């Protein structure tokens, strides 16, 4: 299994998908193995790359995995994070400029997951702090304080949005099991990170009491 992960999956991303011209990773490859350099770059894809190489480095300690994780982390923080309103854009063009600026909380959860795993692997304080910033974005703008749970999406400046779907194949409902699962996942990793690396926590950090409340 480790051989498949390292020499098939991770090696593929290292050898074929790093965008050395524009930064980060390519957004698409055809079924025939042809890179599409002009393809948009999605938040979820990049956050998953960040988590994957961060976790690989934490377990296997290979320097090239750390380099790939750092590449993904730096690209996300530089290009996907909205410097004006906070949160993360849904997608960028191939040059790293915002393309779809809506705030999909499913995607923001993935960025938290990736950043928190990078902080677990490296002890990087900035990654932890930026993960916490995104946590507070979700708590402020997605948490339904009246009925509970989390809404799906908002506009760039956190206003209500008519189309909350992740894709054309999804139902346009204000809440979904899918998004809730992918909020539990990063919140759990934040909790794990704070237990493993207490030196990173600050007075602003999420309280354990609040995280435990989500268990019920």
Residue map of PLM features:
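Well-ordered alpha-helical scaffold segments within catalytic/enzyme domains
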Residues: 48-63, 110-124, 182-197
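Internal, well-ordered domain-core segments that constitute the primary functional module
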Residues: 102-154, 161
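Aromatic- and histidine-enriched alpha-helix N-cap/loop-to-helix transition segments
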Residues: 37-52, 102-113, 126, 174-185
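Histidine/acidic residue-rich metal-binding segments in metalloenzymes
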Residues: 199-208
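Helix-capping and short linker residues that terminate individual alpha-solenoid repeat units
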Residues: 61, 81-82, 123, 139-144, ...
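Low-complexity, Ser/Thr/Pro/Gly-enriched N-terminal "stalk/linker" regions
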Residues: 1-43, 63, 67-71, 75, ...
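Carbohydrate-binding/catalytic loop surfaces
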Residues: 22-41, 87-107, 149-176
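Conserved small/polar residues in nucleotide/adenosyl-binding loops
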Residues: 209-216
């Amino acid at each position: 299994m480790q051989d498949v992960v390292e020499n098939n999956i991770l090696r593929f991303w290292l050898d074929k998908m790093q965008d050395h011209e524009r930064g980060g990773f390519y957004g698409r490859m055809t079924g025939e193995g042809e890179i599409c350099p002009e393809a948009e770059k999605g938040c979820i894809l990049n956050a998953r790359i960040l988590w994957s190489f961060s976790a690989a480095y934490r377990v296997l300690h290979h320097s090239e995995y750390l380099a790939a994780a750092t590449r993904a982390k730096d690209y996300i923080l530089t290009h996907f994070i909205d410097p004006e309103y906070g949160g993360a854009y849904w997608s960028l063009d191939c040059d790293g400029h915002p393309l779809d600026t809506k705030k999909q909380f499913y995607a923001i959860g993935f960025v938290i997951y990736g950043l928190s795993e990078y902080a677990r692997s490296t002890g990087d304080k900035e990654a932890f702090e930026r993960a916490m910033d995104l946590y507070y974005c979700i708590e402020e703008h997605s948490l339904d304080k009246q009925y509970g749970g989390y809404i799906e999406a908002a506009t760039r400046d956190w206003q209500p949005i008519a189309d909350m779907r992740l894709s054309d194949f999804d139902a346009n409902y204000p809440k979904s099991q899918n998004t809730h699962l992918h909020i539990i996942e990063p919140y759990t990793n934040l909790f794990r990170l704070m237990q493993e690396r207490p030196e990173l926590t600050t007075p602003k950090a999420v309280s354990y009491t609040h995280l435990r409340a989500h268990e019920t």
